[in-house]
A protein has these predicted regions:
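Gly/Pro/Ser/Thr-rich low-complexity, intrinsically disordered segments predominantly at protein N-termini
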Residues: 1-196
Length: 196
């Protein structure tokens, strides 16, 4: 998804109440980070295909476990390093029981303890996702895996928390295998149906 600050909002900070009011009335997903509101706009065909493939693979692998997979409509809440609340919409979220779901606005439950999140990158969102959102995701105590999937080439950057430290690994090529929450997924299955 594209991370765009609307030109009218670039230099304006919003209160959490302002954000929640706008979110309640919005027909698109809005993220709230450090007082700024980001509109999450339409996705490319490749983005949609990759996200669908990820959802299908993890649904199959997690079926019958205490973990679940949610699409990009699952909002994740986190307190940033300054103690401010932030609310984002990962492209894919994996959560294990017990889920910490809280009603933050009138229409949605917000997940505060995801185990893993995935972001499908595009030229318009990769800086925002790999810098701003990565730093937020790394603050979530329950988070073990943060995955960035390129849609313009076969490449995945996988951040894993091991003994309190975050380590990254890059996977490239259709034969590579990535493991998240004990689910081994071959990149060929993630990129199935995507042409470059």
């Amino acid at each position: 998804m594209s991370a765009l600050r609307n030109a009218d909002h670039v230099h304006r900070r919003y209160s959490l109440d302002d954000y929640l009011d706008l979110l309640e009335r919005s027909t698109i997903r809005l993220e709230y980070v450090a007082g700024y509101i980001y509109a999450m706009t339409g996705a490319s065909r490749e983005h949609i295909q990759i996200n669908s493939n990820l959802h299908g693979e993890f649904y199959i692998h997690l079926k019958g476990t205490n973990c679940s997979v949610s699409s990009n409509d699952m909002q994740v809440g986190v307190q940033d390093e300054n103690g401010e609340e932030a609310y984002v919409f990962p492209d894919l979220t994996l959560a294990c029981q017990p889920e910490d779901l809280r009603r933050v606005n009138k229409r949605d439950d917000v997940l505060f303890n995801p185990s893993a999140v995935f972001e499908v990158l595009s030229s318009s969102n990769e800086d925002y996702d790999q810098k701003t959102k990565l730093s937020l995701y790394q603050l979530i105590p329950s988070m073990t895996d943060i995955v960035f999937v390129r849609q313009d080439s076969i490449e995945i950057v996988h951040w894993t928390r091991l003994t309190g430290e975050w380590l990254s690994r890059t996977y490239a090529g259709l034969d590579a295998t990535m493991t998240v929450l004990d689910c081994a997924i071959i990149l060929q299955d993630i990129y199935r149906g995507v042409t470059f």
